[in-house]
């Protein structure tokens, strides 16, 4: 079966075609970074309008690249949540309209399940069970994954997500949008040892996270440097960026390793936008060697939000017998807030 997937939960418009037997056939992505840069963050109304402009051309592009027509499509999938309500409605509406016009089933997918399963698109493909570290701008969670739809929450952030800590710290330093990638680039030129920043909950003994204290520490350093008309120099900024990144990565890696030890598992899957961070990948590669454990990441092109992960998650649900393939009445809802535990397989 060929599934056409749509992602529009925030500021990326993604469309992809996935075959349940052959895997990813084609995907296309448009990012709205340039549009939101002047505002320093995502403007929901602008995001929704841009999704409307982009989704149909991207769909045509994917079908052409895959050598398909709509007659070849057996089902459509879309991000049903969580995310920005207006943005979610664009992708859901297009998917449901297409499904109605072709008498196809429409499959609503949890955005985080898309991220969670995206490393399975790469080779070598991790086998179940594994521990998953989901790290993005809005979420930081550790999950035990025993199969498609079989997820156990091990720990999560109690306040800011890791990606949010990157972005907010970058904003405090006066870096551009998107802040996380700007901070990571600047950190390459910095000396992380120059600033002693906290590692919140590093030794808490549990698998939860907290990054608000780190953000406050960064703010304190910035205020100290700019007091009495002073300024944060370029090298100061680079050093602070390096220290901030090092603190976040150390906490993420330590908690992930603790999760592996507590579960007795030896496979770690890392997904979400922060999963593209080079320091995190390198740190985990070193830290996992003594455990004889393996880390699995999605391709860099699929770390950000994308349609491929949505179509692929739908395909995995179809193969696991967890998708309703009956043609419905195409009434639908989106869920801006949606707990991953709500989609557990019975």
UniProtKB/Swiss-Prot annotation:
Binding site for substrate: 134-138, 167, 180, 277
Documented EC number(s): 2.3.1.234
Single GO MF annotation: N(6)-L-threonylcarbamoyladenine synthase activity
Cofactors that this protein relies on: Fe(2+)
Binding-site residues, Fe cation: 111, 115, 305
Location relative to the cell: Cytoplasm
Swiss-Prot/TrEMBL catalytic activity: L-threonylcarbamoyladenylate + adenosine(37) in tRNA = N(6)-L-threonylcarbamoyladenosine(37) in tRNA + AMP + H(+)
Disulfide-linked positions: none
Cofactor note as given: Binds 1 Fe(2+) ion per subunit.
Any one of the GO BP annotations: tRNA threonylcarbamoyladenosine modification
Gene3D superfamilies membership: 3.30.420.40
Pfam families per the UniProt record, alphabetical: TsaD
Chief location of this protein within or outside the cell: cytoplasm
GO cellular component, one term: cytoplasm
Keywords of this entry: Acyltransferase, Cytoplasm, Iron, Metal-binding, Transferase, tRNA processing
Annotated family: Belongs to the KAE1 / TsaD family.
Purpose: Required for the formation of a threonylcarbamoyl group on adenosine at position 37 (t(6)A37) in tRNAs that read codons beginning with adenine. Is involved in the transfer of the threonylcarbamoyl moiety of threonylcarbamoyl-AMP (TC-AMP) to the N6 group of A37, together with TsaE and TsaB. TsaD likely plays a direct catalytic role in this reaction.
NCBIfam families listed in its UniProt record: gcp_kae1 (TIGR00329), T6A_TsaD_YgjD (TIGR03723)
PANTHER family, alphabetized: TRNA N6-ADENOSINE THREONYLCARBAMOYLTRANSFERASE (PTHR11735), TRNA N6-ADENOSINE THREONYLCARBAMOYLTRANSFERASE, MITOCHONDRIAL (PTHR11735:SF6)
Name of the protein in question: tRNA N6-adenosine threonylcarbamoyltransferase
